[in-house]
């Protein structure tokens, strides 16, 4: 249930502010898509933690390129 709510929030981001703002994600798939896959695959707690770690890595001095969900 919590995972679905978090997925809904990520989806709202994709359909709302993300379409207006310039793309800034350094990774593929995008951070929001990565979060959705992580939440579906691992659930709210573990998937949320995986998504949070990805968001913390997404900055100008972080990595880049293809980064699949474990």
UniProtKB/Swiss-Prot annotation:
Protein's cellular compartments: Cell inner membrane
Cysteine pairs bridged by disulfides in the record: none
Keywords annotated in UniProt: Cell inner membrane, Cell membrane, Membrane
UniProt entry tagged with the keyword Cell membrane: yes
GO terms under cellular component: plasma membrane
InterPro entries for this protein: Membr_insert_effic_factor_YidD
Membrane topology of the entry: Peripheral membrane protein
Keyword Cell inner membrane: yes
NCBIfam families attached to this UniProt entry: membrane protein insertion efficiency factor YidD
Family: Belongs to the UPF0161 family.
Function: Could be involved in insertion of integral membrane proteins into the membrane.
Protein known as: Putative membrane protein insertion efficiency factor
Provenance organism: Sphingopyxis alaskensis (strain DSM 13593 / LMG 18877 / RB2256)
Taxonomic lineage: Bacteria, Pseudomonadati, Pseudomonadota, Alphaproteobacteria, Sphingomonadales
